Amino acid sequence: MFITFEGGEGCGKTTQLTLLGDWLEKRCHRVVRTREPGGTALGRSLRGLLLDARSEITPTAELLLYATDRAEHLARVVRPALASGAAVLCDRFSDSTVAYQGYGRGLDLGLIERLNAIATGGLLPDLTFWLKLDPQAGLVRRLASNGNTPDRIEAETLAFHQRVHMGFAALANRYPGRIRPVDAGLSVEATAEQIRSAVDVFLNENQSKLEK
């Protein structure tokens, strides 16, 4: 089972991933928690470069760096974990590239789709939770949590983050079976309950397939 968490800045993805992982482990599932960028040694180096506020990276170079991280991450972490029978929970995946580099940066969506297909080998998540939050509220929340020191992406204009939000909305409309919008403006527990409920339904409906 492969579950990804998506959303804009400050939406609470990491918190919700941790809570779902804890819940699954209590139900006797083996869980691998990971993230993009940064799920491998190479990914951690790329993450530092991509998020460093001092980095000057062109949109196309940024896109290719994220694809590099994803290809390495799939080969070294995600696919081996899935093959071993673990549930993989990932903080950001290919949808973020569409939203940030496609809608946010304005790069060609067809190019991004082809690049994602190469990096992932066609692998898609079983479920994706889009933690839906007003971009301005998310930025305020995020900056309050990191000492008002934004990284390179957080420092982008509000208009950029609004375009990213539109990108996630477009993806949710395109893939309603996979992408589940979740109200991230609720309390942490209320948001977690929405996610647990959706995963519970998915597990009940797909138990036989997951056991193969």
From Swiss-Prot:
Q: Got a GO cellular component term for this one?
A: cytoplasm
Coiled coil located at which positions? none
Q: Does the keyword Kinase apply?
A: yes
Keyword Repressor found: no
Q: Which reaction(s) does its UniProt entry say it catalyses?
A: dTMP + ATP = dTDP + ADP
* Keyword annotations: ATP-binding, Kinase, Nucleotide biosynthesis, Nucleotide-binding, Transferase
- MF (Gene Ontology): ATP binding; dTMP kinase activity
**What Pfam families does the record point to?**
Thymidylate_kin
Q: What class of enzyme is it?
A: transferase
Q: Where does ATP bind?
A: 7-14
Task performed by this protein? Phosphorylation of dTMP to form dTDP in both de novo and salvage pathways of dTTP synthesis.
Family membership, please give it: Belongs to the thymidylate kinase family.
Q: Which PANTHER family does the record cross-reference, listed alphabetically? A: THYMIDYLATE KINASE, UMP-CMP KINASE 2, MITOCHONDRIAL
Protein known as: Thymidylate kinase
Q: Which organism is it from?
A: Gloeobacter violaceus (strain ATCC 29082 / PCC 7421)
Q: What gene is behind this protein?
A: tmk
